[in-house]
Design a protein with these regions (language model features):
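Small beta-barrel nucleic-acid-binding modules, primarily SNase/OB-fold domains
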Residues: 2-4, 10-162
């Protein structure tokens, strides 16, 4: 009996971390994080997989958020996902009207391809094309990747605490 319960638990847990969900976008946190409401009125926080958008207080952070909002806010989307991040957000590819929203953010230069975690060729190509055309954040001569921006912010906080 205990073995059956364990097997059922593992199957249900796995299904939570692999698959597809659909819902209406009800919140845009920033340029790579949204919240959707599914048909059961459950909220799901989604981190767009494979991209890293500028932080809210970083150059192009608000433009990135606004563009993502123009693509998905109030619309029905599908999310294909494999896992969750350390904050419990679903890591997924968001589709609106059949378009890969993650890819669209890269095409207009309002996110970096998060190569550390993703190797999608189309994402790398979109980032390169936006960079070459100096679109979005690529207008800056030396844009700072969000990961570096966050690290510098943590270091400043630690230094001021000492």
């Amino acid at each position: 009996m205990a073995l059956r319960m364990l097997a059922l638990f593992l199957m249900l847990s796995f299904s939570l971390f692999a698959g597809e969900i659909a819902g209406r976008v009800v919140r845009i946190a920033d340029g790579d994080t949204i919240t959707i409401l599914d048909v059961a009125n459950s909220q799901h926080r989604i981190r767009l997989y494979g991209i890293d958008a500028p932080e809210s207080h970083q150059a192009f952070g608000q433009k990135s958020k606004q563009h993502l909002s123009s693509l998905v806010f109030g619309r029905d989307v599908r999310v294909k996902y494999k896992s969750r991040d350390k904050y419990g957000r679903i890591l997924g590819t968001v589709f609106a009207d059949g378009k890969d929203v993650n890819l669209e953010m890269l095409k207009v230069g309002l996110a970096w391809h998060y190569k550390r975690y993703d190797s999608t060729p189309a994402y790398a190509q979109a980032e390169s094309a936006a960079h070459a055309a100096r679109l979005g954040l690529w207008q800056d001569k030396s844009p700072i990747e969000p990961e570096s921006f966050r690290k510098a912010k943590r270091q400043r906080r630690a230094a001021s605490a000492n």
